[in-house]
Amino acid sequence: MTNMRKNHPLMKIVNHSFIDLPTPSNISAWWNFGSLLGLCLGIQIITGLFLAMHYTSDTLTAFSSVTHICRDVNYGWIIRYLHANGASMFFICLFLHVGRGIYYGSYTYSETWNIGIFLLFAVMATAFMGYVLPWGQMSFWGATVITNLLSAIPYIGTDLVQWIWGGFSVDKATLTRFFAFHFILPFIIAALVMVHLLFLHETGSNNPTGIISDADKIPFHPYYTVKDALGFLLLTTLLLTLVLFSPDLLGDPDNYTPANPLNTPPHIKPEWYFLFAYAILRSIPNKLGGVLALVLSIAILAIMPLLHTSKQRSMMFRPISQTLFWILVADLLTLTWIGGQPVEHPFIIIGQLASFLYFLLILVLMPVCSLIENKLLKW
């Protein structure tokens, strides 16, 4: 069996990736989220496949087909809610995974980091299109508002929006193409994950200290397979608790009303995991400026390796940087809260201040703080 594991062309790849992989001996539970994201992707693809068997991407029947899945299909309700809440779990793991990367300086592996940013954009696009499919009020108006943002692009904006819509408004053509893209994107994401892992295994994993750990490696199996299995157990427990006890906790009640182009909901807002970016978008009065800020709020991650001015890789031994990191986390939570509030005083000014602080922290305060810490090292 050992010979087959080490010599068979396919088994050899699996062996080098998940069994005999030399791994730092001191990586903490923060390194569990990569495998948890793999689990989330698997859950989403499997549940999505079963939902696609019963869903119809037509404006007249989409809403009732989702109702049919929940009422008439065997265990359809649990498949539907596993898929909807699985997306929330996916984003929780994503945010923690990215946060871990920022805290421990994993962004210095620039190829792995950049593929990760592409993955983040792809998952966000997939989730947005998935939210449109049930064809409820928030699905329709969310699709209208978010796609309309592209009209802010000079010269080609209006034509681009109508090209995406497949007409002069969000309608049957839009829903059909969103379903097609929502179906194919997870497989593209799975392929990107392979590339992400390929680049990661070129360098090996980072560790909490940020120090090269070549002298102290252990095999991935059994140590980290067991550790990942515990993570799987905890995540599935949390997901099933959410699905079985309060499946609609993270959803919007407006989405239980069929889409009506003649009736606008009082507060149009996306799913909770997009609220921080939505708050940044709304904080700028100019349409094009808002769209740029929205894109930059994620794309700013790409310049993080360039903003790394510290002599140390990790924040483990940098208390001032740690403080700024947790201020950034608090700021993102504030933006998430603001994104769900109506556009009125005092939420407008809080959103503007939080958006300004977000960019200030990443672009100015954290790099300057790292330089100060470099000076303190000499004392």
From Swiss-Prot:
InterPro entries attached to this UniProt entry: Cyt_b/b6_C, Cyt_b/b6_C_sf, Cyt_b/b6_N, Cytb/b6-like_sf, Cytochrome_b, Cytochrome_b_C_euk/bac, Cytochrome_b_N_euk/bac, Di-haem_cyt_TM
An MF annotation (GO) of this entry: ubiquinol-cytochrome-c reductase activity
Membrane topology label: Multi-pass membrane protein
Main location: mitochondrion
GO cellular component, one term: respiratory chain complex III
Binding site residues for heme b b566: 97, 196
Binding site for a ubiquinone: 201
GO biological process assignments: mitochondrial electron transport, ubiquinol to cytochrome c
Keyword Electron transport: yes
Miscellaneous comment: Heme 1 (or BL or b562) is low-potential and absorbs at about 562 nm, and heme 2 (or BH or b566) is high-potential and absorbs at about 566 nm.
Similarity comment: family membership: Belongs to the cytochrome b family.
Subunit-level organization: The cytochrome bc1 complex contains 11 subunits: 3 respiratory subunits (MT-CYB, CYC1 and UQCRFS1), 2 core proteins (UQCRC1 and UQCRC2) and 6 low-molecular weight proteins (UQCRH/QCR6, UQCRB/QCR7, UQCRQ/QCR8, UQCR10/QCR9, UQCR11/QCR10 and a cleavage product of UQCRFS1). This cytochrome bc1 complex then forms a dimer.
Full protein name: Cytochrome b
Provenance organism: Ochotona princeps (Southern American pika)
Name of the gene encoding the protein in the UniProt record: MT-CYB
